[in-house]
Amino acid sequence: METSELLKKVRQIEIKTRGLSRNIFAGQYHSAFKGRGMAFSEVREYQYGDDIRDIDWNVTARYVRPYVKVFEEERELTVMLLIDVSGSRDFGSVNVMKKEVITEIAATLAFSAIQNNDKIGVLFFSDRIEKFIPRQKGKKHILYVIRELIDFQPEEKKTNIAQALKYLTNAIKKRCTAFLISDFIDKDGFKDALTIANRKHDVVAIQVYDRRETELPAVGLMKIKDAETGQERWIDSSSTRVREVYKEWWERRQAVMNDSFKKCRVDSVSIRTEDDYVKALIALFDKRN
């Protein structure tokens, strides 16, 4: 993409998503994604009803009267965006590709995070770790992330979600909130890796999919291509049975995916490219409150 065109696209996404994060998501984000725990704030004299476990014995000995430690919520988070950049993200049948919706969702989450003084890091993955952007704060960092979301070209086309989750578990030492954004078209299982990752971190799954992935149009003979393997085949979509088999396959796949999220205790939302992702994200945030 030409530099001028890229910068124009970055600016368009910035205007749209920053406004959403500021005007719509600010309150929901803050309450839905709380801090990592309690951090020490100050000491004060002991008052009736205080927990004796909070007594600061050093200060108490110095002043010969009891003092307690006061704690407050440690609000600052580290937010990681795990972005699927495999070949299937370039699919789209209703004027918008999955890649574009993923970019806007990621940018909205990123702006929401920095407005809450959180740090943002990004991991691009296919069936390997394509790129890692260390966590930082600030608008300049977010604009760099958006540029990468728009223009990044992966080395591989296939998907391995488990690989990305293992990297998250091993490489990110401090607990974080991790948004896993993908279409979840992955021939390999990721349930075990998700279970382990969610024990250490707070993983949230966001599925982005296209309507044409859920059912076939009745248009007769059509050639379909696997965007990740490059394999092609002809099918007769005018056949009711062919369309039913395909739809059943999709529904089974969704059921397995949602069952994995449920068993791993991972909050999730599925967003169709033509639908309003704002409403879907608000519903996700509300579910966590």
Model-identified regions with their sequence ranges:
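Von Willebrand factor type A / integrin I
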Residues: 1-33, 42, 51, 170-174, ...
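Short, contiguous clusters of charged residues that form electrostatic/catalytic patches at enzyme active sites
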Residues: 104, 108, 159-166, 255, ...
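An amphipathic, basic-hydrophobic helix/alpha-beta surface used to engage anionic
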Residues: 1-130, 135, 177-180, 187-188, ...
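Short, glycine/charged-enriched secondary-structure capping and boundary segments
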Residues: 71-72, 95-97, 137-138, 193-195, ...
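Conserved phosphate-coordination/catalytic loops
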Residues: 100, 155-162, 248-251
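Short, electropositive alpha-helical surface patch
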Residues: 132-147, 259, 286-287
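Von Willebrand factor
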Residues: 141-176, 188-190, 210
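Short, flexible loop segments at the rims of nucleotide/cofactor-binding pockets, characterized by
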Residues: 58, 154-158, 181-182
